[in-house]
């Protein structure tokens, strides 16, 4: 690893109302970049790694310093361009243009492989941005908690008469994304057993209350799960072991969980999945000395992992891929039926996407948790009839530990995002909150991603791999005036398997911000409704009609004026 990717430095975003940059529109991306590297947020901040294997916030430390310098000097009518974590230009635009435009890890399709990307990365020519790492809107594990919670709740509705009480979830991975699983299961009323091969990750999740207990052995873990499910308690248990060993052992013992999934970093076999029988230090060393052999060893272990998941599915246990591309990796190693169990989006989430419902998130730039609690109350006031959402907000306040700048996520759709954004902007204007708020989302949203093994798996019209949609989403958010816009490749599922876009907008209390919010927070989720209506989903067409969208090739939306 080049020396410039390592620095023993602790970074935390500024708090309060004193600006380092020239305006809140440039202070916001500066603080969010720094927040991504806060040691309470990032998995490996000294190497600029935020989450998801090698998902970085900047290409190297020289690039980080240059980005910070550029943002502090950026004028109100200038736009900073970021190419794979490197600041490459500042251009005159206008005051309603994005202040930052980001493109991360995009490769011409024929060369969009981990092997080619790793060559570029080693030469200092590329950076893996994951989804929200390189787009500076990661908020820690909370960012995926509600999506995982909604998935588990829907699984309970489909398979267990609406409740997961007395049930248990078997999964693996306690990294930046997977770390949400045990808390999400608990909030959904289920016990969980999560396998994680790094003790440091278990320690972090115990400290932040995302996991309740650690078992010493597999027998100990199963005894705890048996006791808690019998008592009807929702308790999360972690076990330090390798999932490629534990899941086959559970199959051999005839153990029957109630749900099975996985959120290891299987998308990145070189950095994210420990081969069976290896120590983590050995894995890291071999990744440098023998990358091909290391990737093959990891994929062989993934194949064993997926065979066990297939065995659970054959037992009748609801089993699903949670978007890390482990099925694809197993298929490449000869597991021809790896896709016999579904991904979580077609199984549980797509009806939400049809209505533009997805991971709406916001961050208090003040650093004051009270600002988030006040916005929680505002959400309840505006979305007054959604008791399920109110329940989520109550649980989040009680159980979710803020990482870095205080933040909140809640899944809302096209009908509500603009209204909430305008309300937050008004709260800033009249001083109800102490500093501006940024609103963003995961790239995992209804109109912002093409990922045939995850978000766009099994589309009704067969358009799973069509990536025009995230490109259009990024272009429209740029035209609408988002504060920063990002376009990435490979997030979630790895090189060659996804393209996706993100946006962030600042609520600074001004009339100009309100105008931008009206455009961005309507148009962004509307692209998701558009994408699903175009694919033939009746629920999306109904939403398009209700919300007055003009979709020229969708007849139901025409002739209204």
UniProtKB/Swiss-Prot annotation:
GO cellular component: cytoplasm
Keyword NAD appears in the UniProt entry: yes
Cofactor (UniProt): NAD(+)
Catalysed reaction equations from the record: 4-imidazolone-5-propanoate = trans-urocanate + H2O
Pathway(s) per entry: Amino-acid degradation; L-histidine degradation into L-glutamate; N-formimidoyl-L-glutamate from L-histidine: step 2/3
Major site of localization recorded for this protein: cytoplasm
Entry note: cofactor: Binds 1 NAD(+) per subunit.
Top-rank taxon: Bacteria
Active-site residues, as the UniProt record annotates them: 410
Pfam families: Urocanase, Urocanase_C, Urocanase_N
Keywords: Cytoplasm, Histidine metabolism, Lyase, NAD
PROSITE patterns per the UniProt record, alphabetical: UROCANASE (PS01233)
EC number assigned by the record: 4.2.1.49
Gene Ontology biological process terms in this record: L-histidine catabolic process to glutamate and formamide; L-histidine catabolic process to glutamate and formate
Positions annotated to bind NAD(+): 52-53, 130, 176-178, 196, 201, 242-243, 263-267, 273-274, 322, 492
Keyword Cytoplasm: yes
GO molecular function: urocanate hydratase activity
Cellular localisation: Cytoplasm
UniProt cross-references to NCBIfam families, sorted A to Z: hutU, PRK05414.1
Similarity section: Belongs to the urocanase family.
Function summary: Catalyzes the conversion of urocanate to 4-imidazolone-5-propionate.
Protein name: Urocanate hydratase
Lineage: Bacteria, Pseudomonadati, Pseudomonadota, Gammaproteobacteria, Enterobacterales
Gene: hutU
């Amino acid at each position: 690893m080049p020396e410039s990717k390592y620095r023993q430095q602790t970074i935390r975003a500024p708090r309060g109302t004193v600006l380092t940059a020239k305006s809140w529109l440039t202070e916001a991306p500066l603080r969010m970049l720094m927040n991504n590297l806060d040691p309470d947020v990032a998995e490996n901040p000294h190497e600029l790694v935020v989450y998801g294997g090698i998902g970085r916030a900047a290409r190297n430390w020289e690039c980080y310093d240059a980005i910070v310098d550029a943002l502090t000097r950026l004028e109100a009518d200038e736009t900073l361009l970021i190419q794979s974590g490197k600041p490459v230009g500042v251009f005159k635009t206008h005051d309603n243009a994005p202040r930052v435009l980001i493109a991360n890890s995009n490769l011409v399709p024929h060369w969009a492989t981990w092997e080619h990307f790793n060559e570029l990365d080693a030469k200092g020519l590329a950076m893996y941005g994951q989804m929200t790492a390189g787009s500076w809107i990661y908020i820690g594990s909370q960012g995926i908690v509600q999506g995982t919670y909604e998935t588990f709740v829907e699984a309970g509705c489909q398979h267990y008469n609406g409740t997961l009480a007395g049930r248990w979830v078997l999964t693996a991975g306690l990294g930046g994304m997977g770390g949400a699983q045990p808390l999400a299961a608990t909030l959904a009323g289920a016990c969980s057993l999560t396998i994680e091969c790094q003790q440091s990750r278990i320690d972090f999740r115990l400290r932040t209350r995302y996991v309740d207990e650690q078992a010493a052995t597999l027998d100990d873990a199963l005894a705890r799960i048996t006791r808690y499910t019998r008592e009807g308690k929702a308790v999360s248990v972690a076990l330090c072991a390798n999932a490629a060993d534990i899941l086959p052992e559970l199959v051999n013992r005839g153990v029957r969980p109630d749900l099975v999934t996985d959120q290891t970093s299987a998308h990145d076999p070189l950095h994210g999945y420990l081969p069976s029988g290896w120590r983590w230090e050995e894995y890291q060393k071999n990744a440098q000395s023998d990358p091909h052999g290391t990737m093959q060893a990891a994929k062989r272990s993934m194949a064993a992992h997926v065979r066990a998941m297939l065995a659970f599915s054959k037992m009748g246990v609801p089993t699903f891929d949670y978007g890390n591309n482990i099925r694809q990796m197993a298929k490449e190693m000869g597991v021809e039926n790896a896709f016999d169990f579904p991904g979580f989006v077609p199984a549980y989430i797509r009806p939400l996407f049809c209505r533009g419902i997805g991971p709406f998130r916001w961050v208090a730039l003040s650093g004051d948790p009270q600002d988030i609690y006040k916005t929680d109350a505002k959400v309840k006031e505006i979305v007054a009839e959604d008791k399920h959402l109110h329940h989520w907000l109550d649980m989040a306040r009680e159980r979710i530990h803020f990482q870095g700048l205080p933040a909140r996520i809640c899944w809302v759709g096209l009908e509500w995002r603009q209204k909430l954004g305008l309300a937050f902007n008004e709260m800033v204007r009249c001083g109800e909150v102490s500093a501006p708020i940024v609103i963003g989302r995961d790239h995992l949203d209804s109109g912002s991603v093409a990922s045939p093994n995850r978000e766009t798996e099994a589309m009704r019209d067969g358009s799973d791999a069509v990536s025009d949609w995230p490109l259009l989403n990024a272009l429209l958010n740029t035209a609408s005036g988002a504060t920063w816009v990002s376009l990435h490749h490979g997030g979630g599922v790895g090189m060659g398997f996804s393209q996706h876009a993100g946006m962030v907008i600042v609520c600074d209390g001004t009339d100009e911000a309100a105008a931008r919010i009206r455009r961005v927070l309507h148009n962004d989720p509307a692209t998701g409704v558009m994408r699903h209506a175009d694919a033939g989903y009746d629920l999306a067409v109904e939403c398009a009609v209700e919300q007055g969208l003009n979709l020229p090739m969708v007849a139901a939306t025409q002739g209204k004026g």
